[in-house]
Amino acid sequence: GLAAVLPWGLCFALFKRIARWQWLYGVQCREALAQALQRDCCDDADAWLAERRLVTLLDHADHYLLRTRSVAWIERHVQVHGQWEPGGRAALLWTFHWGTGMWALRHARAHGLKAPMVLAAPSGPDFVGRAVFGLYVRARMRSVDLALGEPVIFVPGGMAEVRGALACGQQVVVVMDVPQDQVAVTRVTPLLNVPVSVPAVLPQLAVDQSLPVTVFYMGVDIRTGFR
């Protein structure tokens, strides 16, 4: 919550220092580093881990920044490449589980898109005995509601709402890198020369209905904190 109370420049400088703490997000970072080394995506393990921790800190901070900063403030800190699909027409907006994407949702809404987001329901084994974690996840989902101005569509069980939104000429935001065990139908496709499983239902829906698809992501300049 430091991002909610500190000037952003000071907060980001503090985050860069905190990201050097080797114990921070220890298990998650070690698992991620093992994957990066396996895929030959890492030359300097210490630098890679510091960046991984920084991106995680920023991902958490964006929840609080979205709640406490104006659209104008956010847009002053974002450099945009490309454009959104025009509003008023059904379309799919695809993105990925890569930190710092919250501001992109606010940007989409500010540019006229009506786009509910498809998210996994906050339930299941990951939430058992983790009350604080559950409250935080639900608060983040509320931030997604606020960013887009549309209620989240929860899955499983949300396909009727997805079809309804598309029938009303809305866009639907979909995160495509979902674990194989969390979706019923998948397809194998190459990514960075590695076969990966991706959800198949919504891509097939896009083909069947000739829906425009816009792929978007929001990166971060780790020197400045700009997106």
What are the roles of these predicted feature ranges?
Residues D40-D44, G112-A115, A147-G149, A200, ...:
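Structural alpha-beta junctions
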Residues R76-G82, G149-P156:
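Short acidic-hydrophobic, aromatic-tinged amphipathic segments that line or gate anion-handling sites
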Residues G87-R89, A147-L148, C168-G169, Q209:
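Structured helix-beta-strand junction loops
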Residues G1-M102, R138-S143:
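Membrane-anchoring hydrophobic helices of lipid-metabolizing enzymes
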